[in-house]
A protein has these predicted regions:
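Extracellular/periplasmic, surface-exposed regions of secreted and cell-surface proteins
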Residues: 1-196
Length: 196
C-alpha cells in the first residue's frame, strides 16, 4: 500500500494484492487485485479561508478497486469418480460400482468484484455536524453459479462455473451531530446519527 499527501490537500492511495488458491487450476490459481483512490480537501485551499470559522473539513473523493472471491467447491475443476452400491447381489452382498466421471466447468477462475465510488465528506461547527455522501457502482463478473440448462440426453447436470454477472448501484447518505455539555459538573457527550 502506498499513501501520499501533498500540501494536506491532495491525497493519493494505491494498494494491490495477489491471492492464490488451490481450488483453481494451475493457470488460474493466482489473482491480482489492485485498488486506488484520490481525494481533494477543498477546505484547505487558500481561497476557502473565509469559511474556516464554520467549515472544518470539505473533501471530495473517488476510488476504484477490485477484489477476488475464491469461495468455490474444493477442486471443482477436477474430474472425480465415486463408489456406490448397485442393486446387483453377488455371493449374498450388494456389489459396488464406480460412478460416471463428474462433469467439470471450463476455465474455473476467481469471481471478480470491481467497485467504483465517488463521494464527499464535510464537517461543520467544530466537527459537531458531519455529512457524508457516496454514489457507487459494483460490477461482479465470473459469478460462480449453476450453469445453463442442457438437454436431458446429456446424462448429467451442468456443473457450477463462472457463468454469471451482476451489477448493483446506489447511494448512501449519512448525517450526524455530536456534542457535549456539563451535567452535574461532569462532561456529558451525546450523538445523533441518521443514514439513507
Amino acid at each position: 500500500r502506498v499513501n501520499y499527501s501533498l500540501l494536506k490537500r491532495y491525497i493519493f492511495e494505491f494498494s494491490a494484492r495477489e491471492d492464490g488458491s488451490s481450488k483453481f487450476p494451475s493457470n488460474q490459481r493466482w489473482g491480482f487485485f489492485p485498488s486506488g483512490s484520490i481525494g481533494w480537501r477543498l477546505s484547505e485551499e487558500p481561497w476557502m479561508k473565509a469559511t474556516r470559522g464554520w467549515l472544518d473539513n470539505f473533501k471530495i473523493r473517488a476510488n476504484a478497486g477490485a477484489l477476488g472471491n475464491g469461495t468455490v467447491a474444493a477442486y471443482a475443476f477436477l474430474t472425480t469418480m465415486g463408489m456406490k452400491k448397485t442393486t446387483a447381489v453377488f455371493d449374498g452382498t450388494l456389489q459396488n460400482k464406480v460412478s460416471d466421471p463428474s462433469v467439470v466447468p471450463d476455465n474455473l477462475t476467481w469471481e471478480k468484484v470491481a467497485t467504483y465510488d465517488i463521494g464527499l465528506d464535510a464537517d461543520f461547527l467544530k466537527s459537531r455536524l458531519s455529512f457524508s455522501g457516496d454514489y457507487y457502482v459494483r460490477n461482479t463478473t465470473d459469478l460462480y453459479i449453476n450453469g445453463p440448462e442442457i438437454p436431458a440426453t446429456f446424462g448429467d447436470s451442468t456443473p457450477k462455473g463462472n457463468y454469471g454477472a451482476l451489477q448493483t448501484k446506489g447511494w448512501e447518505l449519512t448525517l450526524s451531530w455530536r456534542d457535549q455539555f456539563k451535567m452535574g459538573g461532569k462532561d456529558f457527550t451525546y450523538s445523533i446519527k441518521g443514514s439513507l
